[in-house]
C-alpha cells in the first residue's frame, strides 16, 4: 500500500512539474537565436574609433570569452597594426594563426593562449601587463600607444578575420559601450552559438497580441534593448536589477517587475512576478484582461547586454537578418491616444463617421496605455483643415478614478462660420513622472496627439410667428379706421330706417362704438337699455288733453 501511495505522489509531482513548465506552451530551442517571431543578439561592450599612431599603426584589442579549445586567427589582409589578445578565463585555448609581418601580436599575462603557426616561421609574441578586465587593458594600451582603434568582444569564436577595410568613425577616443561586433567592417567574427540560450513558442490567434519574455533568476543579463515591431502587449520579466529599454514608439501595453525606459521616460515596476511560467501566465492574462498569449520566450544567455526583436509570426515573412529600426518621422516619441465623447460622463464615444454640431460640447480623453502612472499635461490645442488652422480653447474636466487619463472638453463654435467638413483636432502634450532615484519630476518633450472629427455648423430652426414691418402696421391701422367708419355709417342708417328718434343722439352711438371698440362685438359687454318711444307733437297735445280729463274724473267722482 505504501509503495502504491509513493508511486501516486511521484506521478503527481511529475505531472505538476510538467504542467508548470508547459502551462503556456511547449518551449523549443531557437536555433541561431532567431526565428519568425523573435531575434536575440548579444550586445557586448566594445568601441571603434579612427585612431592611428603617427606611423599609421592601428591598435586593436580582442577580448576572448568562453574560450574554445581551438579557433582561427587570420591576419593576412590586416593593415599595419597592433593586436592585443586578453581573456579573464582560465581555460587554455589554441589559435591557428595566419600571420602578417605588418602586425604585432600581444597577449596579456595570465591569458592562456597558444598560437599554432602553419608555416613554422619564428613568431614573436609580446607580453602585455596582467589585467583584471577589458577596461584596464584599454587604459594600458591608450597610455602605451597613444590611443586605441577598437575593442572587440569575441565569445566562443570559430574564426577571427581582419579584412583590411578602413574604419570611418569620427571619434578618436575609445569608450566602451554595448555594440554589435558584426557592424565593424574591418573585422569579421564567426562565433559558436550558445546552446539553449533562447527557447520560445508561438500560438496563433485573432485579436490583440500578447508576448511574454522571461529571464529566469540566476541569469546574468542586466540590460535588455527591446524592439517591438508591431502594436502589442508585452510582459518583460527578469531578475532583480534587470533594466529594460524599449526603442520604438508603438501603441503598446507593458507589464514588468523591473525598471523600464521607454523613449528615455522611466517606468516603475508594476508588480512582483516570479520566474514560474504559471505565475507569469496568470498575472499577464489578468492584467491585460486577455484570453490568449501569442508567444512565450525564455532567455538563458549569461551576458550583460542583449538586444531583442519581437514581431507577429508570419510564414511568408521570416526575418533572416535583423535590420536597424528607426522611428518614422510621423510616429510620436511615445504612445498616446485621444478618444472623443459626446457626454460629460465620458461613456458615449464618438466614432470617426459621426458628425458633431458646432454648438455642442465635445469631451476628449487623452491617455497612454504604456504610461499609466504618468501625468499628462496639455499646453495647447488647435483644429486644422487645409489651409485653415485655428487655435482651440479647451477646459480641463475633473476625474476621480485611479490612473485617470487627461480629460478635456471643447466647443467647435469657432467653426460656425465655415462649411461642414473634416477637421484634425490636435493637442500638444507631454508626460511627466517622478524619478525613482532623486524624486525629481521628469517630463518628456512635447508631442502632438490628434483625432479626426467631422464638424457640421449649427443651423437654428426657422420662427413660425409672423413679423410685421412698418408698412404692415400702417395698413392694418388704416383698415381698422375704415371699418370703423363703415360700421358707424351702417348703424346710423339702421337707426334712421327703424324710426329711432334723434334723442338717441350721438351719446347712444358713441356708447355703442365704445363698447364695440372695447369688446370687439356690437353687443358689447353691457346690457342694452330699452329705447323709449316719443309721439309726434299732434299726438302729444291730444294725449295731454286726455290725460288731463282722465285725471279730473276721479276727483269729481270722489267729490
Swiss-Prot record:
Biased composition (Low complexity): 536-546
Described function: Vascular endothelium glycoprotein that plays an important role in the regulation of angiogenesis. Required for normal structure and integrity of adult vasculature. Important for endothelial cell shape changes in response to blood flow, which drive vascular remodeling and establishment of normal vascular morphology during angiogenesis.
Residue numbers on the Extracellular membrane side: 21-473
Subunit structure: Homodimer; disulfide-linked.
Annotated signal peptide: 1-20
Gene ablation phenotype (knockout): Viable, with survival to adult stages. Brain tissue shows widespread vascular malformations with localized widening of blood vessels. During embryogenesis, blood vessel connectivity between the dorsal aorta (DA), intersegmental vessels (ISVs) and posterior cardinal vein (PCV) appears normal at 72 hours post-fertilization (hpf). However, blood flow through ISVs is significantly reduced. Blood vessel pruning is increased, probably due to aberrant hemodynamics. Arterial ISVs have a slightly increased diameter, while venous ISVs have greatly reduced diameter.
Cystine residue pairs: 25-201, 47-174, 381-427
GO molecular function: glycosaminoglycan binding; transforming growth factor beta receptor activity; type II transforming growth factor beta receptor binding
GO biological process, one term: epithelial to mesenchymal transition
Membrane side Cytoplasmic: residue ranges: 495-559
Entry protein name: Endoglin
Transmembrane segments: 474-494
Subcellular location: Cell membrane
Top-level taxonomic group: Eukaryota
Keyword Membrane among record annotations: yes
Lineage: Eukaryota, Metazoa, Chordata, Craniata, Vertebrata
Gene: eng
Glycosylation: residue positions: 55, 79, 109, 133, 170, 302, 352
Ranges where the record places region Disordered: 528-559
Keywords: Angiogenesis, Cell membrane, Disulfide bond, Glycoprotein, Membrane, Signal, Transmembrane, Transmembrane helix
Membrane topology (UniProt): Single-pass type I membrane protein
Any one Gene Ontology cellular component term annotated for this protein: plasma membrane
Chain intervals with Polar residues compositional bias: 547-559
Amino acid at each position: 500500500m505504501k509503495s502504491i501511495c509513493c508511486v501516486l505522489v511521484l506521478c503527481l509531482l511529475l505531472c505538476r512539474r510538467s504542467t508548470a513548465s508547459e502551462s503556456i506552451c511547449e518551449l523549443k530551442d531557437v536555433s541561431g537565436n532567431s526565428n519568425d517571431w523573435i531575434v536575440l543578439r548579444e550586445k557586448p561592450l566594445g568601441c571603434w574609433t579612427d585612431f592611428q599612431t603617427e606611423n599609421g599603426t592601428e591598435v586593436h584589442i580582442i577580448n576572448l570569452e568562453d574560450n574554445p579549445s581551438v579557433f582561427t586567427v587570420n591576419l593576412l589582409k590586416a593593415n599595419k597594426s597592433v593586436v592585443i589578445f586578453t581573456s579573464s578565463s582560465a581555460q587554455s585555448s589554441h589559435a591557428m594563426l595566419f600571420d602578417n609581418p605588418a602586425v604585432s601580436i600581444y597577449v596579456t599575462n595570465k591569458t592562456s593562449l597558444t598560437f599554432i603557426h602553419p608555416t613554422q616561421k619564428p613568431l614573436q609574441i609580446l607580453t602585455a601587463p596582467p589585467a583584471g578586465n577589458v577596461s584596464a587593458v584599454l587604459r594600458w594600451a591608450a597610455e602605451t600607444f597613444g590611443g586605441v582603434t577598437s575593442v572587440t568582444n569575441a565569445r566562443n569564436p570559430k574564426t577571427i578575420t581582419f579584412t583590411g577595410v578602413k574604419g570611418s568613425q569620427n571619434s578618436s577616443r575609445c569608450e566602451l559601450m554595448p555594440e554589435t561586433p558584426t557592424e565593424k567592417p574591418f573585422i569579421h567574427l564567426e562565433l559558436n552559438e550558445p546552446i539553449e540560450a533562447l527557447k520560445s513558442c508561438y500560438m496563433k490567434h485573432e485579436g490583440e497580441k500578447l508576448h511574454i519574455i522571461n529571464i529566469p533568476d540566476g541569469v546574468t543579463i542586466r540590460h535588455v534593448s527591446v524592439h517591438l515591431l508591431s502594436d502589442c502587449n508585452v510582459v518583460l520579466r527578469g531578475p532583480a536589477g534587470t533594466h529594460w529599454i524599449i526603442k520604438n514608439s508603438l501603441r503598446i501595453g507593458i507589464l514588468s517587475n523591473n525598471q523600464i525606459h521607454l523613449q528615455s521616460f522611466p517606468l516603475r515596476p508594476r508588480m512582483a512576478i516570479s520566474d514560474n511560467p504559471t505565475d507569469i501566465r496568470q498575472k499577464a492574462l489578468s492584467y491585460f484582461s486577455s484570453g490568449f498569449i501569442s508567444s512565450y520566450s525564455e532567455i538563458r544567455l549569461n551576458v550583460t547586454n542583449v538586444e531583442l526583436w519581437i514581431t507577429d509570426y508570419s510564414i511568408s515573412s521570416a526575418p533572416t537578418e535583423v535590420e536597424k529600426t528607426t522611428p518614422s518621422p510621423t510616429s510620436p516619441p511615445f504612445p498616446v491616444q485621444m478618444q472623443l465623447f459626446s457626454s460629460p460622463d465620458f461613456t458615449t464615444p464618438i466614432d470617426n463617421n459621426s458628425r458633431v454640431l458646432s454648438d455642442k460640447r465635445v469631451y476628449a480623453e487623452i491617455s497612454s496605455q504604456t504610461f499609466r502612472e504618468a501625468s499628462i499635461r496639455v499646453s495647447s490645442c488647435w483644429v486644422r483643415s487645409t489651409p485653415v488652422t485655428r487655435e482651440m480653447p479647451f477646459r480641463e474636466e475633473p476625474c476621480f478614478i485611479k490612473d485617470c487619463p487627461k480629460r478635456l472638453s471643447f466647443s467647435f463654435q469657432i467653426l460656425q462660420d465655415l462649411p461642414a467638413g473634416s477637421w484634425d483636432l490636435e493637442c500638444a502634450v507631454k508626460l511627466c513622472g517622478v524619478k525613482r532615484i532623486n524624486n525629481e519630476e521628469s517630463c518628456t518633450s512635447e508631442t502632438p496627439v490628434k483625432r479626426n472629427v467631422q464638424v457640421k455648423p449649427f443651423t437654428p430652426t426657422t420662427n413660425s410667428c409672423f413679423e410685421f414691418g412698418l408698412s404692415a402696421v400702417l395698413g392694418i391701422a388704416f383698415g381698422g379706421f375704415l371699418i370703423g367708419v363703415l360700421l358707424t355709417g351702417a348703424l346710423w342708417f339702421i337707426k334712421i330706417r327703424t324710426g329711432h328718434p334723434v334723442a338717441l343722439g350721438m351719446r347712444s352711438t358713441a356708447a355703442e362704438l365704445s363698447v364695440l371698440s372695447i369688446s370687439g362685438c356690437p353687443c358689447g359687454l353691457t346690457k342694452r337699455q330699452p329705447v323709449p318711444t316719443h309721439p309726434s307733437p299732434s299726438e302729444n297735445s291730444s294725449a295731454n288733453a286726455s290725460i288731463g280729463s282722465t285725471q279730473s274724473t276721479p276727483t269729481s267722482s270722489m267729490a
